[in-house]
């Protein structure tokens, strides 16, 4: 058992020594190859940076414009950066799934001229002197911003179209107001006939003998045209003021009225007449009322309707109108 343990210890020590030697040899080899391939690693790191910038620009929706970072640090700084593991590889895993559009680009090789390496101050001035490449960045962005104002400008177009038919309404011209036609004064009547009726009640007739007595008592005298007239004087002298006729055609009377009957009589006065027409009208109204009371009839107007105060005022207005027209 002790021999087996000793053998295992020796084998383990040999394995450990072999691992140490292999690790040391591997590290030496990698370090020598790192210094040997330093320019290639620098180019690779720049290409990785370019591909990273392109992926970022693609994610942001930017077109062909790219911003390349040019490393003009001194040789010592580059060697120091080469000795360290490249930091660009730390940003590649998030974009490892993205497929680069141009894995190998020749323009970056031309953009890294060797003569810029001895300039130590340019790495500080180069970021400040980049407004020129930044200007193209706004050009691809402008197409994205341009579509936004388009609906804004297109919106007023229907408003203008809706406002165009309203232009004639915006400035309506006042329609000429038709001047009212001058009201022509109604020509005054220069003559008129005032008519009253004394009629029996409905379904009856006036008795001739009673009618004759009432007519004579009212001052009427039988005369021209076989009708009765009321003169200025009760004895029949002077001009006639108004007359009385039969309501039945031809309107005449027979002096022998014992067997005479009629539905009524008509009293009429022509204006203008002799004397005062209004006084003659009052006398005419009194005569009609007297006859109606004597024969048991009623006084009617020219339309054979019941006489009313309004109708009497209308008769008086007609008389005044005729008097004014003949004044």
Curated annotation (Swiss-Prot):
Protein name (record): Cell division protein ZipA
**Mode of membrane association:** Single-pass type I membrane protein
Alphabetized InterPro entries for the sequence: Cell_div_ZipA (IPR011919), ZipA_FtsZ-bd_C (IPR007449), ZipA_FtsZ-bd_C_sf (IPR036765)
Its function, per the record, reads: Essential cell division protein that stabilizes the FtsZ protofilaments by cross-linking them and that serves as a cytoplasmic membrane anchor for the Z ring. Also required for the recruitment to the septal ring of downstream cell division proteins.
| Organism placement in taxonomy | Bacteria, Pseudomonadati, Pseudomonadota, Gammaproteobacteria, Enterobacterales
Recite the UniProt keywords alphabetically.
Cell cycle, Cell division, Cell inner membrane, Cell membrane, Membrane, Transmembrane, Transmembrane helix
Is the keyword Translocase in the record?
A: no
Pfam families referenced in this protein's UniProt entry, alphabetically: ZipA_C
User: What are the TM regions of this chain, as residue ranges?
Assistant: 6-26
Q: Please name the gene that encodes this protein.
A: zipA
Predominant location: membrane
NCBIfam families according to UniProt: septum_zipA (TIGR02205)
* Localization annotation: Cell inner membrane
Q: Which family does it belong to?
A: Belongs to the ZipA family.
Description of how the protein assembles with itself and partners: Interacts with FtsZ via their C-terminal domains.
| Disordered, as annotated region | 41-185
Gene Ontology cellular component list: cell division site; plasma membrane
Give residue spans on the Cytoplasmic membrane side.
27-327
What the entry lists under HAMAP family is as follows: ZipA (MF_00509)
- Which organism's genome codes for this protein? Shigella flexneri
